[in-house]
């Protein structure tokens, strides 16, 4: 059994995902597995992975179902004690796994924690890094929106199984934010200051969509989704209005 399963959903991003995989094959620690979940790509992703062989990497193709389902599917077949959902267009530094393993031990097998990350342009220019601490991650999620990078969140597998991503296409691009809010009302999200991954800012990012109607509908669905979570609503109380403002 490995300690960490890295689940990488991908859709028509062969040119990106190959670089993402390469960044993981240069890790300081080899106590992990990579699960590539192909969400029904129509480019040459399937053709490429048919002949791709590496002991750390397994390829799984599913019918196109959006990222939430792809992530949940990956978690369901993961062999690790912890799961890391990593986007197929970003990069891991060589300390990503080793740092996660260090803090799993230091924090005594936490339910969830978040490593730090940096934004970078497609040509390698660093833009910004998250500045936070463990006592205010939940507050930041409420007041500042989705400050967490999915790439840097490490979740214990039993927690990932009990609290899956929403699989509705109506929440596509915000399903991770909905989950972080839900989890923050139940567990402490520990913050680790070490930077271990890079979020690449490019035009093809799904969260960069500028379709105003879709954004409005998605935000309305997010609020309805959160209101259906009684535990979360009891936890957040009147602060719920601040989430509405962020939307």
Which residues does each PLM region occupy?
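Short, acidic, metal-binding catalytic loop of nucleotide-sugar glycosyltransferases
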Residues: 22-31
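Conserved nucleotide-sugar donor-binding catalytic segment
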Residues: 135-213
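Short aromatic/hydrophobic "clamp" motif used to bind/position activated sugar donors
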Residues: 83
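N-proximal low-complexity "stem/linker" segments adjacent to membrane-targeting elements
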Residues: 1-23
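Acidic donor-binding/catalytic loop of UDP-sugar-dependent glycosyltransferases
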Residues: 44, 90-103
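Flexible acidic/His/Gly-enriched loops in nucleotide-sugar-dependent glycosyltransferase catalytic domains
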Residues: 67, 97-164, 210, 216
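Glycine-rich, basic loop-to-helix element that forms the pyrophosphate-binding segment
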Residues: 62-78
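A conserved acidic beta->alpha catalytic loop
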Residues: 23, 38-47, 87
């Amino acid at each position: 059994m490995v300690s960490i399963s890295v689940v990488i959903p991908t859709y028509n991003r062969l040119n990106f995902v190959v670089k993402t995989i390469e960044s993981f094959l240069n890790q300081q620690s080899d106590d992990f597995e990579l699960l590539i979940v192909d969400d029904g790509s129509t480019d040459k992703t399937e053709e490429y992975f048919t002949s791709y062989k590496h002991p750390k990497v397994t390829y799984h193709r599913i019918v196109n179902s959006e990222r939430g389902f792809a992530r949940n599917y990956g978690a369901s077949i993961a062999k690790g004690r912890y799961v890391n959902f990593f986007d197929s267009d970003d990069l891991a530094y060589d300390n990503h796994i080793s740092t996660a393993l260090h803090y799993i031990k230091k924090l005594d097998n936490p339910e969830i924690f978040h490593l730090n990350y940096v934004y970078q342009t497609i040509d390698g220019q660093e833009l910004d890094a998250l500045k936070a601490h463990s006592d205010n991650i939940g507050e930041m999620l409420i007041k500042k929106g989705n400050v967490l990078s999915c790439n840097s969140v490490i979740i214990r597998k039993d927690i990932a199984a009990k609290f899956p991503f929403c699989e509705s296409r109506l929440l596509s691009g915000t399903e991770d934010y909905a989950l972080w809010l839900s989890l923050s009302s139940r567990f402490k999200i520990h913050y680790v200051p070490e930077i271990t991954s890079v979020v690449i800012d490019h035009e093809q990012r799904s969260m960069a969509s500028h379709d105003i109607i879709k954004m409005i509908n998605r935000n309305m669905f997010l609020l309805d989704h959160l209101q259906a979570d009684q535990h979360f609503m009891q936890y957040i109380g009147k602060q719920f209005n601040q989430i509405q403002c962020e939307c």
